[in-house]
Structures are given as C-alpha cells and as structure tokens.
From Swiss-Prot:
Keyword presence, Repeat: yes
Pyrrolidone carboxylic acid, modified sites: 95, 119
RLWRNWE repeats, residue ranges: 34-40, 61-67, 86-92, 107-113, 134-140
Region of interest (Disordered), ranges: 147-167
Keyword Signal assigned: yes
Signal peptide: 1-22
Similarity comment: family membership: Belongs to the scoloptoxin-08 family.
GO CC terms: extracellular region
Name used for this protein in its record: U-scoloptoxin-Er5c
Species this protein is from: Ethmostigmus rubripes (Giant centipede)
Tissue localization of expression: Expressed by the venom gland.
One MF annotation (Gene Ontology) recorded for this entry: toxin activity
Propeptide intervals in chain numbering: 23-94, 112-118, 139-167
UniProt subcellular location: Secreted
C-alpha cells in the first residue's frame, strides 16, 4: 500500500489508533516505519510527490478523455438525428413526386436540361462577344499604329522636301 503522507505524525497516530481498534495488525507498524523513513529521505519524498503528481495528471487526462468521448457521442447522436430527418424529408419528397404520376420529375428534368442548354448558349455568346471586343481593340490598335506611321512618314517627307528646297 503506497501512501503519500504530508504529516507523518498524523499518519502515525491514525495507524496506532487503527492498531488499537484491531483493524490493522502487523502491517500497521511496518507502514508507519516505511512512512517515517520516506519522510526522512528527501529523495524518496520527491519520488512520492512525483508519483502523486503523475496520478493527478493521469486522472485529469482520463477525465478529459471521458468528456471528449461524451461530446463525440452527443455530436454523433446529433448527426444521426440530422441524417434521419434528411432521409425522412427525401422519402416524403419522393412520395409526393410519385403521387404526381411522374410528370413533375420529368418536367423538372426538362427544365434543368433547358437551363443547362441556355447556360451553354449564354457562355458561347459571351465568349463570342469577348472575342469580337478583342478583335475590335486589335483593329483599333493596328489602325492607330498605321495612322501614326503614315503621319510620321508624311512629316518626314515634308521635312525632306523643305531640306531639298533649301538646297
């Protein structure tokens, strides 16, 4: 029996009283001697303190693990309830769809296909518009470059003509 007693005299008194009452026999005196030796030996006392601290840490860790387990169980129950609700709603929707003789799902499918087709057409139109804008910008840039070159060429010709006229 390991005991970490901070007050060895109190431990001695408890063991002696227990001996008198007949609850502890030979082991009581041995325990008192061991407690007293441990109290006198600082290294042994330090080891006992470390063991006590490790036991406290273990208890804390076990408690946290238990709390984590309970929380996980609650979250799993909640998720299971949500899944059951979702399954029930889906089942109800299928029942309503079956009652409509299957026309409603077919109509929804056709609407969805039409929507997808329109999205593709809109995307193609947008791409064409972007391409046309790009082509127009390129044409404008090229035209501006050509005008600038011809203006530069014209001014160069005028300058050369003036220089020739001076000669």
């Amino acid at each position: 029996m390991k005991t970490n007693c901070e007050f060895p005299l109190l431990c001695l008194l408890i063991v002696l009283v227990a001996n008198v009452e007949g609850e502890v026999e030979d082991t009581g005196l041995k325990m008192v001697k061991r407690l007293w030796r441990n109290w006198e030996d600082p290294e042994q006392r330090q080891l006992l303190d470390q063991e006590a601290e490790q036991e406290k840490q273990l208890e804390k860790r076990l408690w946290r693990n238990w709390e984590d387990l309970e929380l996980r169980q609650l979250l799993n129950e909640f998720a299971e309830n949500q899944r059951e609700k979702r399954l029930w709603r889906n089942w109800e929707r299928r029942q309503v769809a079956k009652e409509d003789d299957g026309e409603k799902p077919k109509e929804l499918w056709r609407n969805w296909e039409d929507l997808k087709r329109r999205q593709v057409v809109d995307l193609n139109d947008e791409q064409k518009t972007q391409r046309d804008k790009r082509l127009w910008r390129n044409w404008e840039d090229n035209h501006a470059t050509l005008r600038k070159r011809s203006a530069d060429s014209l001014s160069r010709q005028k300058r050369l003509g003036r220089e020739r006229g001076k000669e």
